[in-house]
Design a protein with these regions (language model features):
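Short glycine/proline- and aromatic-enriched beta-strand/turn motifs that initiate or cap beta-hairpins
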Residues: 19-61
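Short loop/turn motifs that connect adjacent beta-strands in outer-membrane beta-barrel proteins
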Residues: 27-35, 51, 67, 102-112, ...
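Hydrophobic, lipid-facing positions within transmembrane beta-strands of outer-membrane proteins
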Residues: 37-41, 54-58, 91-95, 113, ...
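Residue-level detector of the transmembrane beta-barrel scaffold of outer-membrane proteins
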Residues: 38-40, 69-71, 96, 112-116, ...
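Transmembrane beta-strands of outer-membrane beta-barrel pores
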Residues: 43-47, 74-80, 101, 119-123, ...
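Solvent-exposed loop/turn segments connecting transmembrane beta-strands
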Residues: 46-54, 81-88, 135, 162-172, ...
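Outer-membrane pore/translocation modules
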Residues: 78-170, 243, 257
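Outer membrane beta-barrel transmembrane domains
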Residues: 176-257
Length: 257
């Protein structure tokens, strides 16, 4: 009986860790629960000096066991460029693969590392002005880490993105801190605070972009969450007319597989 109680407590603690919720703007190494097979969609408003861009991605991951995940992500894009008519259409398509490399679990905590591969297929429309698609094949390989406890979660991602057709290659680096604002319980009904940074260093042109991010995430059940966040540039080495004022994001994740 005592062994059964200990096992039950361990299962509930691990489930609560998974139910904490993934970071809004950074990848997670957790491949189960709300980070597992399902659907994620969100609206993203990018307000620049010379344009307003709306992006509506749809990502569908699918788990091949507990340590491997594949998926596909598409996006609808609308661009309102100053002094031009607005253009809209479907952007590039991304296939992704996640593979767990390391896992160490403790009571109410876990540390994990995964490798993630993103392959961009440039199917987006490029005949319009401005262009909807990138017209560039892109391959990105990154390492994603996460240390998640019942009280907080710390996430990081470092990767390199190879591009074609004259676009600059870039090094990506992301970090996030997730803090539950309500006591942990099961089934989950939680409110999480997300803060972090998201950066890109464009190696071919030696320019850097760093966004500070913050957001709120509401987990309504073990199969659904809603989230909203804002990103503000703190470093952006681009021409003034192309600078970003802020980025607003709101969306949902639903576990369906």
């Amino acid at each position: 009986m005592n062994r059964l109680i200990i096992l039950l407590i361990g299962v509930l603690a691990t489930t609560s860790v998974f139910a904490q919720g993934p970071p809004i703007f950074t990848e997670t190494p957790i491949l189960l629960g709300l980070d597992g097979g399902g659907m994620r969609t969100f609206g993203r408003f990018i307000v620049k000096e010379n344009a307003t861009v709306y992006v509506q991605p749809l990502a569908i991951p699918y788990n091949l066991g507990s340590k491997t995940q594949i998926g596909i992500a598409g996006r609808f894009i609308n661009i309102n460029l100053n002094n031009f008519e607005s253009v809209s259409g479907f952007g590039d398509l991304t296939f992704f693969l996640k593979q767990q490399l390391y896992q160490k679990d403790g009571k109410g905590k876990t540390f994990r590392i995964i490798a993630k591969l993103d392959q961009v297929f440039p199917i987006g429309k490029t005949s319009s002005m401005p262009s909807i698609g990138s017209d560039s094949w892109q391959s990105q390989l990154s390492l994603v880490t996460g240390y998640v406890t019942l009280k907080y979660g710390i996430y990081g991602q470092v990767g390199y993105n190879l591009t074609s057709n004259g676009l600059p290659d870039n090094l990506i680096y992301n970090a996030a801190f997730v803090y539950p604002l309500l006591p942990q319980k099961y089934p989950p009904n939680q409110l999480n605070l997300n803060i972090g940074i998201n950066g890109k260093f464009f190696t071919d042109v030696n320019s850097n972009t760093i966004l500070a991010s913050g957001g709120i995430q509401w987990i309504t059940s073990k199969t659904a969450l809603f989230e909203a966040g804002i990103q503000i540039p703190i470093v952006e080495e681009v021409p003034k007319a192309q600078k970003t004022n802020y980025v607003l994001t709101f969306g949902t994740r639903i576990l369906i597989f």
